[in-house]
Every structure is written in structure tokens, then in C-alpha cells.
């Protein structure tokens, strides 16, 4: 993220920190629960994008490149954009280590993407809208450059993420070092896509219990069992988070 809006927004400085870039994947995807989240994210992404071999895909807010790698391994030709050169350096290094030659990494801003309209078959942006200064503007840009599909995720305002979001915002306001984020209702997201000529096609919700709780327990077996139980109890649909969705361009 960068270009013009709110250059002093915390997200620009936070993700430009070399220490953040080096520890990013370890903080989010290490341990049994982190690995479970990573595998689930890759599976959901694959199901939503469908056939991607030789198709042009854009990953916005690629970070260390995890989603871009999944797409490239599926046969897509991927352009991966991030505002943080430090994050991109990690992504480029890992792509080279895996001999992934079908990913083009470049610095760019989600608020002002440097691509022509409908340049990509599908556009993916994970864990980004929650941190952007102007999320509606970002949705407009994602939709503008997508020929057919846009896939995003977000923390739900009807989940326990609401309370963590409130706490982090309060901590940030008090000058404490943290990563505040916003939460979204389904209506907010649906309206933003509708304004740009897209309709939500399908939705996946991941956890009812907080991710931090599952990581503290550290048991894949417990996480799968407890979340399955809560799903059967009817709690996943109203309270599950994060929410990943695929939106499709409406016929002209």
C-alpha cells in the first residue's frame, strides 16, 4: 500500500519494517494451527478461482507471496503487487528458491493499480482490506482490473474479531505498537462490489473461535473437532471469521 492516500497510515510503516517482513510468515503460519490456516487458505483459493492454467492472475497486497505461489503452482501466470519493498524482497527470494518463474513481483498500491481495465482473469487480495486506509477505493481498483473474478477476505463484524479490533484500535490510539484493523459486515462488502458491477458468488467462513485461542491451545485435532462441532450447532454461518468470498462481474 502506498501512492497517495494517508501515507502516514500505520500500514505503510508497519509493513516496510524489515523485521516485520522477516518474521511475517513465522508469526502467522508457524505451528500446527498456522499450518492449518495456510493449507485451508490455499484450498479455498483454489476452489474459488477454478481452472487457472495459463490464465493471468493478479495478487494485490501479496506480502511474502503466499497466495501468488499457490496460483503459480496451479499453472497461472501471476503478477504480485505490494507497497512494501521489504515484503517483496522476501517473496522474490522464496520464489527463486522454489524455481517459480511465472510470477512477476512489482511494487504498487492497492488504491491506484497501474494496470489497464480488465487486465486479469481474476484478482486476489487476502488480508489487505482490513488494513487499507481507503478500503472502498481498493475494492473499486480490484474490480476495475478484473475481467471476471475478485477474491478477498475480511474479519467479520459479527465475530469475536470485532472485540479484538476494538482493543487494537484503542491500543494504537494510546500510542502502543500494534496492528489495528477494521471489521466488515456482509452488507458493507456486498454494497462495495455491487457499486462496481460485481455480485458475490460464494463465501467461506473459517473459525468461530478466535485464531489466537486456537494458537494458544496449539492442537490441530482440537481445532478441527471444536470448529466442526460449532458448525454443526449452526454457529459458523453467523459468527465465522475470517470470511473469504469470490465476486463475479455481472453480465453487461
What kind of feature is each model-predicted range?
Residues 167-168, 201-252:
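A C-terminal cap/extension of S-adenosyl-L-methionine-dependent methyltransferases
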Residues 64-111:
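Class I SAM-dependent methyltransferase SAM/SAH-binding core
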Residues 136-149:
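A short glycine-rich, Lys/Arg-flanked "PGG" loop and its adjoining helix->strand segment in the class I
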Residues 171-188:
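Acceptor-substrate binding/catalytic loop of class I
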Amino acid at each position: 500500500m502506498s501512492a497517495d492516500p494517508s501515507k502516514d497510515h500505520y500500514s505503510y510503516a508497519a509493513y516496510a519494517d524489515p523485521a516485520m517482513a522477516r518474521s511475517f510468515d513465522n508469526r502467522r503460519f508457524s505451528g500446527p494451527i498456522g499450518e492449518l490456516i495456510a493449507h485451508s487458505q490455499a484450498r479455498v483459493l483454489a476452489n474459488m478461482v477454478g481452472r487457472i492454467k495459463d490464465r493471468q492472475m493478479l495478487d494485490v497486497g501479496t506480502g511474502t507471496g503466499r497466495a501468488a505461489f499457490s496460483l503459480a503452482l496451479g499453472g497461472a501466470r501471476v503478477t504480485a503487487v505490494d507497497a512494501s519493498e521489504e515484503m517483496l524482497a522476501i517473496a522474490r527470494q522464496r520464489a527463486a528458491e522454489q524455481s517459480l518463474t511465472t510470477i512477476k513481483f512489482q511494487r504498487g498500491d492497492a488504491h491506484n493499480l497501474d494496470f489497464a481495465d480488465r487486465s486479469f482473469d481474476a484478482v486476489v487480495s487476502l488480508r489487505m482490506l482490513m488494513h487499507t486506509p481507503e478500503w472502498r477505493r481498493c475494492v473499486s481498483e480490484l474490480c476495475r482490473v478484473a475481467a471476471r473474478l475478485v477474491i478477498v477476505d475480511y474479519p467479520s463484524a459479527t465475530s469475536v474479531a470485532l472485540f479484538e479490533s476494538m482493543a487494537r484500535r484503542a491500543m494504537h490510539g494510546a500510542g502502543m505498537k500494534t496492528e489495528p484493523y477494521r471489521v466488515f459486515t456482509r452488507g458493507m462488502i456486498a454494497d462495495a462490489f455491487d457499486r462496481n458491477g460485481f455480485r458475490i458468488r460464494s463465501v467461506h467462513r473459517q473459525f468461530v473461535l478466535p485464531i489466537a485461542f486456537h494458537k494458544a491451545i496449539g492442537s490441530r485435532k482440537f481445532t478441527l473437532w471444536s470448529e466442526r462441532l460449532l458448525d454443526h450447532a449452526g454457529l459458523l454461518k453467523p459468527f465465522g471469521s475470517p470470511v473469504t468470498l469470490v465476486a463475479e462481474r455481472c453480465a453487461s
